[in-house]
Amino acid sequence: MTTFSPYAARRARLAAQLGSNAIAVIPTAPERPRNRDSDFLYRHDSYFYYLTGFSEPNAWLVLSGSGRATLFCAPKDLEREIWDGHRLGPAAAPEVLGVDEAFSVSELDAKLPRLLENSAAVWYPFATHKGLETRVDGWLSAVRSRVRFGALCPSRA
């Protein structure tokens, strides 16, 4: 891994453009299966890598307008690492990548509605990742279900 200062500066520039009460959800590219037991050589998403310097598959960056960066990545799994290669894991990600916090990607659907609460807008790459719009709609529905408890749902997506 390289030093994270240029990536942190890029995240700060994007956060400033988002506005103080907005949030961006940026996924990396998925792995592409070649056949039943192997995948094509992985190529990360350029936007994601530009902001994080992180080139593992199945990861998400959530960036708030205040500059808070949350990474969701694959957990450490020594058995899978034999076949897939080294994984950084959520415990090491904040120190290595300079993000504020990191969680396992398995927690994404549970944590993202809370991160989206009380935001005016949510930004994400439209029509670039299969199924992303559906997931964002699901997260926004979860926020809408909490409106009677005082949560505000983003009005722009």
Predicted regions, residues:
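A composition/biophysics-driven feature that prefers long, compositionally simple stretches
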Residues: 1-157
